[in-house]
Each structure stands twice: as structure tokens, then as C-alpha cells.
């Protein structure tokens, strides 16, 4: 299962307080990425923080990892989680007779054979 985790600074926490922990924090996430546990990692564009996509069994497993992060142990972050699941076979939503053939190669002009 994929779990999206995103953090926020706890009220009153500043970037100055966060900065000393960043090398160890990044190293921790890097090791999880190399192990295939962290699938994606992004900096937030809307506010300071990160968004991490975990490949884990459930939210509790993702929380185990975030709780072990240096910034979490220091009590500087709050985490939120969104569990994702594979969508049902989308074809079940289509009406009978709808074209479900494989997509054509959109890099060629429609009707031309790819070379």
C-alpha cells in the first residue's frame, strides 16, 4: 500500500530550530528510499515541509518511520497521513460497447504506422 505523509512545523517552531537536524533527517529518508520504503519525496511548495510517499503495509507502518525521524523525535513536526489503494478496475464503470482498445501511439499522426 502507498501512504502519503506530509508534515507541518509545530506552532512556534522556526526554520532556525529545524536546520541543525536536517543532515541526519535527510540521511534517514535516503536510507529508506534506498530500501524501497520511501518511493517519492518532495519539498512542499505551499509552506515549509515535505511530502513523502511510503510503500508500506498501512498508515501505522508509515507512522513508525516518521516517528523515528530526528525532527519528530525532537517534537518539532506534526504529521498527517493519507492511505491510498489501487482503484477498482475502471473498466467496470464504462458502459457496454465503449472502446477499451489499447491506446494508439500519440507520437505519430493518427492512422500512420510507427516506424
Q: Model features per residue range: what roles?
A:
Residues 1-115:
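Conserved, structured core segments of small domains
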Amino acid at each position: 500500500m502507498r501512504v502519503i505523509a506530509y508534515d507541518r512545523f509545530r506552532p512556534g517552531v522556526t526554520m532556525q530550530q529545524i536546520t541543525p537536524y536536517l543532515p541526519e533527517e535527510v540521511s534517514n529518508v535516503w536510507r529508506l528510499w534506498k530500501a524501497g520504503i520511501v518511493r517519492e519525496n518532495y519539498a512542499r511548495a505551499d509552506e515549509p515541509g515535505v511530502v513523502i510517499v511510503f510503500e508500506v503495509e498501512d498508515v501505522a507502518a508509515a507512522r513508525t518511520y516518521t516517528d523515528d525521524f530526528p525532527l519528530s523525535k525532537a517534537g518539532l513536526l506534526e504529521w498527517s497521513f493519507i492511505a491510498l489503494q489501487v482503484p477498482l478496475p475502471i473498466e467496470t464503470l464504462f458502459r457496454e460497447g465503449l472502446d477499451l482498445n489499447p491506446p494508439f501511439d500519440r507520437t505519430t499522426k493518427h492512422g500512420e504506422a510507427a516506424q
